[in-house]
């Protein structure tokens, strides 16, 4: 009788162990399945964001190229008697027509805001009197330019005056205060037609993506120097506390000396 009770206790204990093993096995299978689904979801998110970033960088390169081609074709057309731009430049040689010429050119470049966006600023530079005029209208509806930026642009233009202009040549970089700009200028016969854009505006669209709590998008130069960083909260002035070397994927800009590095963090998504 005692042996029968002991066997019964042993059988119940074994059944309990078997049940526990089955439950643990089922839990492990569930966790494994969840991990597979999670990994698949992560891959799909990575692939989708990488696809979006590729489309955006392609659009940036295309925009930079179209602007470069526009500047080049306009400035290098000085021998064409039908060139409106050079007719205006001839008038500008007469000081009393300066205001008229600038007004007419601004009317001509109103479309630049639609073609390239208000962040891309087209300007005219005349070497004769070292003057720089904003031609494209800004997002606030004005043609004003910061005087410190204006002087910085003049210095950079003069430093580029001896270099041969090429449509496919990468845009140059200049810094003014805490801001970094990309610049392209075509020069001919003492006249320069150019465009500049603040680098942080290039990255702002990425702040709309689900990058995660510690995710970021950085613009990095050819030497690996971090130029501008964006998180879901916006532009980051001090990126020293971010692990900016541990990115998920990157996209190279062919028209400028930069690459865009993107990190996706699953924490907080």
Where are these regions (language model features)?
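Extreme N-terminal signal-anchor transmembrane helix of membrane signaling/transducer proteins, especially
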Residues: 3, 7-47
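Extracellular/periplasmic juxtamembrane segments that couple receptor/chemosensory ectodomains to their
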Residues: 191, 211-216, 220-269
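Soluble sensory domains of the PAS superfamily and closely related sensory modules
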Residues: 148-169, 240-245
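Extracytoplasmic/periplasmic sensory segments of membrane signal-transduction proteins
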Residues: 14, 47-152
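Conserved beta-strands of PAS-like sensory domains
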Residues: 135, 143-154, 175-210, 262-265
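Amphipathic coiled-coil signal-relay and dimerization helices
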Residues: 84, 130-138, 181-183, 224-231
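Short acidic-hydrophobic surface loop/beta-edge motif
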Residues: 170-177, 184-188, 245-255
